[in-house]
A protein has these predicted regions:
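N-terminal post-signal-peptidase region of extra-cytosolic proteins
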Residues: 18-20, 36-39, 67-70
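Gly/Gly-Pro-rich "capping" loops immediately C-terminal to redox-active cysteine motifs
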Residues: 24-28, 42-81, 99-104
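The canonical Cys-X-X-Cys-His
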Residues: 27, 31-40, 114-118
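Short phosphate-engaging motifs
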Residues: 36, 44, 110
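C-terminal capping alpha-helices of c-type cytochrome domains
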Residues: 78-129
Length: 129
């Protein structure tokens, strides 16, 4: 990963405290913004963006039947709670060249909630820190 592909918009975040702000029901509501481009269902189809089933813990750019940007494929880090939080603040600044056009989620509670929701949508949700 080079500085040409990724500009860090990372602030030091206590991910445990951040996720404690989250609410699963609120996350489902916030995810409706995401659902314009992403499905989040077992066996679901890719849409404009990849299916986000099992996204937490998955390697970025790894859904085999989705055509990612070169930047996302090169990024290839695991979508941890921390990585997802940093990405969702401002996706295009975090991974330069990503195809994701969404501006980001400024509110911590919105990010925490949608991360909790996405984590719940998988075969083996990751334990919370």
């Amino acid at each position: 990963m080079s500085s040409e592909t990724t500009e860090k918009v990372v602030e030091v975040v206590d991910i445990k405290a951040l996720l404690a702000m989250g609410d699963l029901a609120h996350g489902e509501k916030v995810f409706k913004k995401c659902s314009a481009c992403h499905m989040i269902a077992a066996g679901g189809k890719n849409m404009i963006g990849p299916n986000l089933w099992n996204v937490i813990g998955r390697t970025a750019g790894s859904v085999s039947d989705y055509k990612y940007s070169k930047a996302m494929v090169a990024y290839a880090k695991e979508w941890t709670f921390e990585e997802m939080n940093s990405y969702l603040i401002k996706p295009q600044a975090y991974i330069k060249g990503t195809k994701m056009a969404f501006a980001g989620l400024r509110k911590e509670k919105d990010r925490a909630s949608v991360i909790l929701y996405m984590n719940s949508k998988g075969n083996n949700p990751k334990p919370l820190p």
